[in-house]
Amino acid sequence: MTRNDLLDRLATTQASALETQGLGLVPMVVEQSGRGERAYDIYSRLLKERVVFMVGEVNDQTANLVVAQLLFLESENPDKDVSLYINSPGGSVSAGLAIYDTMQFIKPDVQTLCMGMAASMGAFLLAAGAKGKRSALPNSRIMIHQPLGGARGQASDIEIQAREILYLRERLNSILSEVTGQPVEKIARDTDRDNFMSGDQAVDYGLIDKVITRRS
């Protein structure tokens, strides 16, 4: 399988996932090459430029696709940055942590950019980008809060789930403290309820490094 075939398969799978989420049909682009015309879906074309999209809910399917693309781009060039564009309301903590761990694991720096909304795990992953390379567009909204969960069943089962949620809250707060420079105690207070921020407020908080109005 050639490089272009791998790119097509990865991005076409992502395109299908986005359509499944009700985000509409994915546009196609046509390029001229020495062998004639070639049609790409738009995500395949952008993946060739090392751009990965995380759009919609963070779930296992999203995580598998993002992780696969990050690993592939690392194998292509371990010294060239990857750009992760985020427009997400958040979702599964375990799926988000799979993406986070992969971002830290691979050699290339991962630049993150919020366009629209980065909430919950979306904001967490936005802040987890390489220091100095985390940004947002001017009208983006960023929201942090503590993990949500519910439990049912016997009292012992509910106790187990409660302990797990408390562990995840402490772990997420610890990571947010590392990437923002804020004390863990402040993170815990600020994530007790939904905490919305503008791009400039997110810069002051340390979640991102800059607000971008135009491509440089």
UniProtKB/Swiss-Prot annotation:
Reactions catalysed according to its record = Hydrolysis of proteins to small peptides in the presence of ATP and magnesium. alpha-casein is the usual test substrate. In the absence of ATP, only oligopeptides shorter than five residues are hydrolyzed (such as succinyl-Leu-Tyr-|-NHMec, and Leu-Tyr-Leu-|-Tyr-Trp, in which cleavage of the -Tyr-|-Leu- and -Tyr-|-Trp bonds also occurs)
Instruction: Report a single Gene Ontology molecular function.
Output: ATPase binding
Question: One Gene Ontology cellular component annotation?
Answer: endopeptidase Clp complex
**Cross-referenced PROSITE patterns:** CLP_PROTEASE_HIS, CLP_PROTEASE_SER
**So where's the catalytic machinery, residue-wise?**
S120, H145
Q: Keywords assigned by UniProt?
A: Cytoplasm, Hydrolase, Protease, Serine protease
User: What subcellular locations does the record give?
Assistant: Cytoplasm
Example GO BP: protein quality control for misfolded or incompletely synthesized proteins
Keyword set includes Hydrolase: yes
Quote the InterPro entries the UniProt record gives: ClpP (IPR001907), ClpP/crotonase-like_dom_sf (IPR029045), ClpP/TepA (IPR023562), ClpP_His_AS (IPR033135), ClpP_Ser_AS (IPR018215)
Alphabetized SUPFAM superfamilies for the sequence: ClpP/crotonase
What EC number(s) would the UniProt record show?
Answer: 3.4.21.92
Q: Which Pfam families match?
A: CLP_protease
Which top-rank group of organisms is this from? Bacteria
Return the similarity comment: Belongs to the peptidase S14 family.
Which PANTHER family would you find in this protein's record? Answer: ATP-DEPENDENT CLP PROTEASE PROTEOLYTIC SUBUNIT (PTHR10381:SF70)
What is the role of the protein in this entry? Answer: Cleaves peptides in various proteins in a process that requires ATP hydrolysis. Has a chymotrypsin-like activity. Plays a major role in the degradation of misfolded proteins.
Subunit notes for this chain? Fourteen ClpP subunits assemble into 2 heptameric rings which stack back to back to give a disk-like structure with a central cavity, resembling the structure of eukaryotic proteasomes.
The protein's matches in HAMAP family, at most eight in alphabetical order, are given as: ClpP (MF_00444)
Q: What is this protein called?
A: ATP-dependent Clp protease proteolytic subunit
Tell me which species this is from: Cupriavidus metallidurans (strain ATCC 43123 / DSM 2839 / NBRC 102507 / CH34) (Ralstonia metallidurans)
